[in-house]
From Swiss-Prot:
The gene is pcm. Its main location: cytoplasm. Signal peptide: none annotated. Pfam families: PCMT. It comes from Lawsonia intracellularis (strain PHE/MN1-00). This is Protein-L-isoaspartate O-methyltransferase.
Length: 226
């Protein structure tokens, strides 16, 4: 059963939430160097509080991750913004998301105008977000309940791939399903609770990687993960 409320009249007041959302964009994103207009606009448009449990809605725009159940979290706003910016998103590009989770990152990608494919392994989250996307009008997002480390061969290649969980290595199926040219953003690390955020680019059959910084994500579970 869906644990999230989509009514704009729920507590906190809609006007308060709008102010919180604008403050989030200014203080957490713009003042920290996020400049991509697609990302900033999407994070102003998407109501983050609708993607967290009702009891946490008043904290939805704070600068830290929040639990969403089943051992999963919604990433802090800055991490969502930096990962999305690294994708160099342009409307019309296809993107594969590994780990639908709360659905917030998925909605940001869809709001930008990307063609979104999203995989989730936690059954309860898969059905919750599927219903939530329908209620919020995100009818073009395609989701699947499956092992995200295997990718989604049926719809490959993808212009972009974003992985929202950390594994010990870059899953080979994802690298194979990344288009050329293409960009993948993924946390990688041998420590299950500490990874390096990496930006992988593929161009002219050459793959290059850049370490962006240290991050901490939940485990990437699957055949090519933990």
């Amino acid at each position: 059963m869906l644990r999230y409320h989509t009514s704009k009249n729920n507590f906190p007041l809609a006007s308060d939430l709008r102010r919180q959302r604008e403050r989030m964009v200014i203080t957490q994103l713009e003042q920290r160097g996020i400049t991509n207009s697609y990302v900033l606009t999407a994070m102003r448009n998407v109501h983050r509080h609708l993607f967290v449990p009702e009891a946490l809605q008043s904290r939805a725009y704070d600068d830290y991750p929040l639990p969403i159940g089943y051992g999963q979290t919604i990433s802090r706003p800055y991490i969502v913004a930096i990962m999305t910016s690294l994708l160099e998103p342009t409307p019309g590009l296809s993107v594969l998301e590994i780990g639908t989770g709360s659905g917030y990152q998925t909605a940001i990608l869809a709001n930008i105008g990307l063609e979104v494919f999203s995989l989730e392994r936690v059954r309860e989250l898969y059905f919750q977000t599927k219903e939530l996307f329908f209620l919020l009008g995100y009818r073009k997002i395609r989701t699947c309940l499956s092992d995200g480390t295997l990718g989604w061969e049926e719809h490959a290649p993808f212009d972009r791939i974003i992985v929202t969980a950390g594994g010990p290595n870059i899953p080979l199926p994802l690298l194979n399903q990344l288009g050329d040219p293409g960009v993948m953003v993924i946390p990688v690390g041998q420590n299950p609770r500490e990874q390096e955020l990496m930006c992988i680019t593929k161009k002219n059959n050459t793959v290059t990687s850049t370490v962006i910084g240290n991050v901490a994500f939940v485990d990437l579970v699957g055949d090519y993960g933990w």
